[in-house]
Amino acid sequence: MAITGLTAGGSAEYEVRLDGTRRWPTGGDRPPSLIRTLPPAGPLELAFGSCRVTRPHRPPYTLSVDEHELGTGVDALYALAVRMQAQPADEWPHMLLLLGDQVYADEVSPETAAFIRARRDVSDPPGLEVAGFEEYARLYREAWSQPTLRWLLSTLPTAMIFDDHDVHDDWNTSQAWRARMRRQPWWSDRIAGALETYWIYQHLGNLSAAELESDALLRRVRSAADGGPVLREFALAADCDGGGGRWSFSRDLGRTRLVVLDGREGGSSRRAGARCSTTTSGAGWSSRRAVTSTIS
């Protein structure tokens, strides 16, 4: 849904209704969800981070690994949301940028592990790793459905790009790695499910209203009686050597341009043969001031 005609530097509360019934917000003592527009001048504040393993927000998972073998420490994305709820809106970041490993397909939570066990025999590969579209969709729902995180994502404009664990540890680090994985009988369902759900849960939110309007794949999915086969065909082609899929994107934020590059899947870089580029992602979250630059 594209909303136009908003005033720069403004904010507006909103709610979501389906068939006349309010679906969001769901209640509780959280602040209202807001649509905020960028200020006409001044610096931009961007919160960013990566490498978030989804776990329940309770001990022992919130303990450090030194305190308990199941501990993963404080969920910094959750902490950001809690901090924002205690602040006035003018102290919030203007945007959230997630730089990879938004989900871990190869290191699932106890809840997702139970979901997988109920669906298939985990003694067969890939075991308790995510196997396809349905399990990926479950993974994304779990990652972002906790009420405090839902509020954060409903209020803070967010952009994101994958790294390796969104698909598989060390994804696309070399042509030899790709050849080895393609020999696994479960891999085609895994990579198809990974890119299908990435397109739905991450990529579409990176596009502007104009880009969404002109996106040929989105039109095909919307017009199909069942968009699943259309999306799977695209995902498998995107992963093929030379098939390509454009995942890099940019956003113009006033006088600042944010450019986010795909360092994992860019198909054009494999047309000559070996996959040679890798990326590293740092764990943790921080907030910094974006440098204001003039876009010519």
Regions found by a protein language model. Name each.
Residues M1-S296:
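Metal-dependent phosphoester/phosphodiester hydrolase catalytic core
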